[in-house]
């Protein structure tokens, strides 16, 4: 490739990366959403249904995390997704699976524990990014 073509490719790559970054507005919105999810999820079925939304928020923020935070969260998530059983069978979709079926009491307990720990971890990370803003915006 000639120099001009290489320069254009590099510029496009750089611009694309900058445009797809996780902005402060998105972080604040996700911080408020995690707080709302945790505050309004009272029963087990609601918690289980909202696991997917928490995982979506994590997937959006994961590239912005420090490598040690990301590794810790990935280990945490993969550890739980293997334990959650749907109708007595391990979920095949991993972390992206939406838990729609009725769960046994033991699986429901694992899933709600996962919801609580995941929500608390996400809230902790998001709060560390905006320590003064999270409570004021509510």
From Swiss-Prot:
Pfam family membership, one: Turandot
Biological process annotations from GO: cellular response to heat; cellular response to UV; innate immune response; response to bacterium; response to heat; response to UV
Q: Where in the cell is it found?
A: Secreted
* Induction summary: By a variety of stressful conditions including bacterial infection, heat shock and exposure to ultraviolet light.
Which branch of life, at top level? Eukaryota
One Gene Ontology term, aspect cellular component: extracellular region
Major subcellular site? secreted
User: Which InterPro entries did the record assign?
Assistant: Turandot
Leader sequence residues: 1-21
Question: Which UniProt keywords are given for this protein, alphabetically ordered?
Answer: Immunity, Innate immunity, Secreted, Signal
Q: Which family does it belong to?
A: Belongs to the Turandot family.
Role of this protein:
A humoral factor that may play a role in stress tolerance.
This chain belongs to the protein called Protein Turandot B
What organism is this sequence from? Drosophila melanogaster
What gene, per UniProt, encodes this protein? TotB
């Amino acid at each position: 490739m000639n120099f001009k073509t290489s320069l254009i490719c590099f510029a496009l790559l750089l611009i694309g990366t900058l445009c797809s970054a996780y902005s402060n507005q998105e972080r604040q919105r996700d911080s408020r959403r995690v707080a709302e999810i945790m505050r309004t999820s009272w029963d087990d079925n609601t918690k289980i249904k909202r696991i997917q939304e928490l995982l979506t928020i994590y997937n959006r923020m994961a590239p912005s995390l420090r490598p040690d935070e990301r590794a810790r969260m990935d280990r945490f998530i993969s550890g739980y997704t293997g334990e959650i059983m749907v109708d007595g069978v391990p979920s095949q979709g991993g972390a992206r699976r939406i838990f729609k079926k009725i769960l046994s009491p033991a699986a429901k307990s694992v899933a709600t524990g996962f919801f609580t720990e995941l929500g608390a971890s996400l809230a902790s990370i998001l709060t560390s990014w905006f320590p003064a803003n999270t409570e004021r915006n509510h």
